[in-house]
Amino acid sequence: MIKMTDLLLDEHYAQHKGKHFLPRLKDFMKLLPVVLVVLEGLEVARVVRAMCGPTDGKNAPPGTIRGDFGMSISNNIIHSSEDLESAKKEIGIFFKTDELFNYERADLQFYYAEDEREN
């Protein structure tokens, strides 16, 4: 869990620099601490985005995180990376290399067939 700073948010939202909504978004992101997680798995970005639902909580279906707990497009309850490339960039912004660990999960064989497992 961390408290967001302007420095972190400027780096994370660099593609939105100068857009009218950015100051309000940054203020919202700094209100409370946030929980950061790195997930892994087959097609993890696609799967997590499906679990989150559409960005606008009002239009997200029940059973998704945004559909069950979100009501706003700007005061968003959750963020998920668009794809693996975005995830790698975001992980680099928010995590130090010594905070991440490579390991082989003992239960991997129960989730994926051998030919489906990512290396």
Segment roles from a protein language model:
Residues 1-119:
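Non-catalytic terminal and connector segments of soluble metabolic enzymes
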